[in-house]
């Protein structure tokens, strides 16, 4: 049992509508909108990812973000790892899912942008646990399409598999990532 109620998913039509994309874009500070080069902006509260380049919108996707207690970190980061056909390691149990296919929790692509080696105390749904060592946050696909639009992950940003494939092809190591509340 989670210690708090999970936020409801954003209505699917709102998450997918071009109006919500334009509202998200308009809500950005001008210096973010006009930043040179290609960069990713994650609007965590809107559960929306934007890929901008020289002030132009290149891609926009609905996403899932971290659940209460596992919030996706905010701040300025950069892509430091890209993996085609990643291996998933459960952040609590250490269980590895190496086989690729429809059940891999990371989908077909992984794009890492944040690493935290301070450890943390977090709730796993049933109890409080302590995680020692490093955790990495990134963008990845999901076999669970129903999760997109919700705050439901362990901190990572989930996209539909077809969307993470497109994003993977558009970013490189060093691409700037800004995560806003």
Regions found by a protein language model. Give the residues of each.
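N-terminal pre-domains immediately preceding structured catalytic cores
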Residues: 1-181
